């Protein structure tokens, strides 16, 4: 939302020297990507401090920079910076030609969040927040897609779901948007409460609870408690949309004073899927049942877990006035989010790129999806699953054994704890091999994958398993004639959709 700096300063109780009549056309915390006219917030992250890059942001055209008082000198509007090429700590004043300057606050991250909350309140329209251990992004994308059949929807980009990303997404709200859909992530208790206080959702969607982030939690029950914070944060006239098939999430509506809508495959679910038919890499078809109404849905996303994600979208769509038929119809051209179940081809080999993140429950769901696709061989390339805490080794063993028992042909474990998956898979009698990196995985795939194979790539974000796919693709293309190379490059661009 565009705002004059005078109003921004008022909202943030900021002082300093800057052009109060100037209009901020956007907001950024990254000096590398900032565009002219945007307001730069010098926030401190885990590895970098934005105050070290104020000068670069202003040189790139930032209309002003929001800096904390401790970084500002007592006179004028000078910032203590590590100015590039000057060596050591240097005092550099902001450029004056465009009246760019410094907006001074006590805490820059808090200021970013306060401004985001203020913009959200000025916008004053319905906002849907999605959380859960798995499926947040796909569910959010599905909700935005369904709602876009009638409304102008603002959605968070990718997984901008933390204390930095969520405020930046809210600051992009514009008067023309009718509704917004965001996701809320967490790794500690209290984080979803804090994010909800910024976003102020009217509708809260919880997808599931699974053993993730156990490095920071003592039990799955504690994870459930953290996810429940979204429901606690909803207003009494809000709506909780809950996975009725999840043993934890299904209980979240018991004490909620607002409206509760459950979805899933169980007979007690209010938005229910019946007669589910797996269509392999083409997705699935199923009946969506709401009361006495029934509509047949076609969903071009692989895996039964995506049936659940799409049911949440149907439920939210109907809560916003769409008919069952309208909501179900919108699912037919839903495209997968980046690195989340994207189907690509390398020659006559089918690859399911689901390597954005992983946990035992999510891996099991994708292996189930893999088993619905006809193949000469089914190969699972599984990277280690991070943040599982003391139970990490045991969970990798269990995942390796259960993956093998589903009937796959080969398991390749990538990095770290994935070695325990490989050992368990071998103990179950299938071919399994451990590699130390995505690069080694790419070499194995280039050498061993054959026509007719279907390959699943699944790993935690930190493994960066997408590198294996990129290297494998490049290797396959480099061995083809020029005309074929151009064709393959076009074919392998993932088909995703934005709203």
Task: List PLM regions with ranges.
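Active-site beta-alpha connecting loops in nucleotide-dependent enzymes
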Residues: 45-48, 337-339, 355-430, 434, ...
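Phosphate-binding loop of NTP-binding sites
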Residues: 89-91, 97, 104, 108-244, ...
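Short acidic-hydrophobic, aromatic-tinged amphipathic segments that line or gate anion-handling sites
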Residues: 102-107, 432-441
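ATP-dependent carboxylate/acyl-activation modules
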Residues: 130, 147, 338-342, 363, ...
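Residue-level signal for inorganic ion chemistry
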Residues: 8, 38, 57, 115, ...
